[in-house]
Amino acid sequence: RYFEWQEKRCYRSAKKIVVVTDSFKRTLTSRGIDPAKIVVVKNGVNKALFTPRPKDEALKAQLGLAGKTVIGYIGTHGMAHKLDFILQSAKKLEDNPNLHFLLIGGGAMKESLLKLKDELGCTNVTMLDSVMKEKVARYISILDVCLINLKKSPLFTTVIPSKIFENAGMGIPILMGVEGEAKDIISQYGAGLCFEPENFDDFKQKLTALLEPATYAKCKEGCRHLADNFDRKLLAANMLKVIESAK
């Protein structure tokens, strides 16, 4: 209770409060904070690093993925990310030999996920350790679809995964199992398709639809528009205006 009081005291004494989602602004407003002092500056993409480039065919061949349609997840393998659902879904899609799932990263659930992959006998999944930040773009380049997934929970309707912006910056259509504000962004820009978290039938349907050439092309264009509107240079300029207005 004391720390909550201190938190509210800081909010009320601040000239400006910067939050990274509209949901956070609504939460603070519901707690009695003046909405006029709350500014939303969302995360974005470093377009100097994450920009469209040709697929790294050498890397793709090195990983044994030549000729495959690669569905990729690059990021933390934690409890929130529900990657066991992805492995189980991949197993059910083994009858499509062209599809291959690439999971890159580490985290609290990595070992149990590796064990689950072996138990399921997945032949269409490759799991790699984390790569250096400066090499991430190289791995994103070999993806045909960026996979973003979170556990089905009201808690995650307020978050916006940063993977959205990096993959959109590189023009990789997004298949996302996250509800709420993140889903709204994907839908607004047409940068991909969203499935109900932890629903395999919807996952399969949306993946199939996303890979249709016409839909895929539209989503690539949607990625471009999304990245243009979430360019970090623009967001930094907005942030600077907020700081200057608070002087």
Feature names for model-found ranges:
Residues 1-17:
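Membrane-proximal helix-turn-helix segments that form the acceptor-binding/catalytic region
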Residues 23, 44:
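Carbohydrate-associated surface elements
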Residues 98-105, 110-138:
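Nucleotide-activated donor-binding/catalytic signature segment of Leloir-type glycosyltransferases, i.e.
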Residues 1, 51-64, 220:
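A short helix/loop element that forms part of the nucleotide-sugar donor recognition site in Leloir-type
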Residues 81, 132-139, 144-168, 175-184:
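Nucleotide-sugar-dependent
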Residues 65-90, 102, 220:
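Conserved donor-binding/catalytic core segment of Leloir-type glycosyltransferases
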Residues 202, 215-229:
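A short, well-ordered alpha-helix in the C-terminal region of glycosyltransferases
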